[in-house]
Amino acid sequence: MDTLTVPGGGSSAPAAHDPDSSRHPRPGTGSGAVASRPAAESAPAPEPGPADPTGLDHALVRALIEHRRTRVARLPSRKRVDTFVDAAVGLLFPQQSTDGHANEEHLLARINLLRAELASMLHAVLPPQRSAETAGQLIQALPAIYDRLRADAAAIVEGDPAAESLDEVIAAYPGFFAITVHRIAHELNRLGAPILPRLFAEAAHARTGIDIHPGATIGRALCIDHGTGIVIGESAIIGDQVKLYQGVTLGALSVLKSAAGQKRHPTIEDRVVLYANATVLGGDTVVGHDSVIGGNVWLVTSVPPHSFVYHTSQIRVRNVADALGNSDYSI
C-alpha cells in the first residue's frame, strides 16, 4: 500500500511490493528488473493502520497534558463529589446512611472529616486559606440548613396523601433528596465558591431527574411531589410553603449571554401550587401568593395573588363513522 503520512512527518507503513512485477517483467525491461506502474495504477487505496505514536498521538498527548495543567483538570471527580454528597446527607439524616453510630464523639469526627474533605475539594477553585474558611462556614451553617430541611420533609408529609411518615419521606423521596442537596449547594454558592456548588447540584440531578440551580432562592417548607423533570433556574425565587409537581419549569425567556447576572427567572410567592408540566418563564414574571397554576400552563406574564390559571383542553366529540376509522393518535 502507499505510505500513509501523518502530522509530524511519520509514516504508518512502507509501500507494498508488487509480487507480480519480478516474475513477469514488462517488455523492454531487463530480466529480473522491476517495472514501474503508471501513477494512476500505483497501488490500492491505503488501509487503516495502527496509530503512529510519533505523529498524531504525540500531538494529542501534548494537548491533553496542557489541559491537565489548568485548574479545571484538578476538579474533584464525579465519584468523589457523589461520595461527599452522600456523606453530608447521611450525616444530617441517618435514614440515608448505613452508619448507625449516634454518639457525640463519632458525629463530631464525621463533621471534621466532612470539613477537611470539602476544604480539599475547594482547593481546585479557591486559594488554600479561603478553601479552609469556606468549608468551616458551610459546616457552621448546617444547623440552619437542617432546620429548613425538617420543615421541607414535614411539608411533603402534609402535602402528599401517599406519604405515611417523616422517615419514609427522608429515606425514599427523590424530591426531598434534591432539596437537601440544593440547600447545601446553595449555601456554598452564597459563600462564593465557584463550580463546586454546580457539581453538587448535578449529582442530585443525575440521581433524581430534578434540576435545581444552586443559585435559586427557595423559602421554607418546599413540597416537591414526584419531582421528575422539574427545572428551577439560577435566579428563580420561591417563597414559603410552595408545592411543585413533576415537570414544572421555572425558566428564562431566551436572552443574550450579556444578561448573565440579571434576574432571568420568575418569582413564586408564598403558598403557590404549580401542577404537572406548568411552565413559568421570565425574570419579570411574578406569581402572586396563594395562586394555583394548572397543569400544562404556559405563563410569561405576572398574575395577582389568589389567581387560578389553567389550560383549557379542546374537546371534540367524534361521530360514529369517525370512531370506527383509524385513530387520530397512535403510539
Feature map (PLM): residue ranges:
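Terminal amphipathic alpha-helical/low-complexity segments used for targeting or macromolecular assembly
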Residues: 1-202, 324-331
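Short regulatory "switch" loops immediately downstream of catalytic or recognition motifs
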Residues: 95, 250-256
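Short helix-capping and hinge/turn segments at secondary-structure transitions, especially at repeat
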Residues: 189-193, 205-209, 223
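Short, positively charged
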Residues: 192-195, 263-267
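Short acidic loop-to-helix transition motifs that present clustered carboxylates
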Residues: 205, 217, 257
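Left-handed beta-helix
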Residues: 208, 213-214, 219-220, 225-234, ...
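Extended hydrophobic/aromatic segments used for targeting, binding, or gating
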Residues: 257-263
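C-terminal membrane-proximal segments flanking the terminal transmembrane helix
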Residues: 280, 318, 322-329
